[in-house]
Amino acid sequence: MCIRDSSKSGNTLETIVNSNILIKKSDKNIFITENKKNYLNSLAHKLKSEIVHHNNFIGGRYSVLSEVGMLPAELMGLNSKSFRQFNNLIKNQKYLNALISNVGSTINLIKKRKFNSIIINYDEKSQNFFSWYQQLVAESLGKKGKGLLPVVSNMPRDNHSVMQLYLDGFKNNFYTFFYVHENNTPKINNKFILPSQNFLKNKNIQNITYAQKKATENVFTKKNIPFRSFEIKKRDEKTLGELFCFFMLETILIGRALKINPYNQPAVE
């Protein structure tokens, strides 16, 4: 069994607790932390475990494409180089134009006092990705009485809870629709379809959720609710790396426009 412990400071309480619950001396343990005196370094030396030193200028939420994220990716059999095709990104004018356009639109929405960034997520496998997004946006921008509140809604479940508020409640929200095209989703059993629902015949889960997404976007358009939409054609390392970079750069640029430091978290400290 291999346990990988990561903490930039090496003194994060939750990491220390988890370490002492999970780690056994006989395990293969790998520690990722700054090259300084801290708890994880001391524990690693005691266990004679491997230590990967983390650059102290890369904050936790920005470290996803560093060794903190790429070591476990490699252990999972993924290609870390495919995540980090930075040279291709900076030469991709379409990507850069989209980034600049989205930053400008977000700043304009903030000026209109729309402070809630709601993710309308139609991809269950991306829930952890958007947990990272919540930390990125809230911890980077929530300073000096400013910031955005990132909220993640998982669809279609939340159609039956918070969608009423999104459509007809207060108007200080803006939205990001997120969808990943999947080929191998379960298909409906035509045998049990009643005549009133014949339109469901030969459909799979992707057909249905995509139709729900498009219908919801149409309603948002009719009601003049601000939103943007991401449709991912292929789930792979390259695409995920592009998404990580996009949201990190977007957050940094918004922070600069708001004249706040997007890299620290002084109130938490």
Predicted feature residues:
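Glycine-rich phosphate-binding loops that contact phosphosugars or nucleotide phosphates
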Residues: 4-95
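Short beta-alpha connecting loops at secondary-structure transitions
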Residues: 52-57, 200-201, 257-259
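Acidic catalytic cores of enzymes that act on phosphate-bearing nucleotides/polynucleotides
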Residues: 78-82, 92-219
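Structural beta-sheet core signal
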Residues: 5, 31, 119, 175-179, ...
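Conserved beta-strand segments of alpha/beta enzyme cores
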Residues: 28, 50-52, 147-149, 226-228
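C-terminal hydrophobic structural anchor segments
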Residues: 206-248
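A generic structural motif
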Residues: 7-11, 72-78, 124-125, 182-184, ...
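C-terminal amphipathic alpha-helical interaction region
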Residues: 261-269
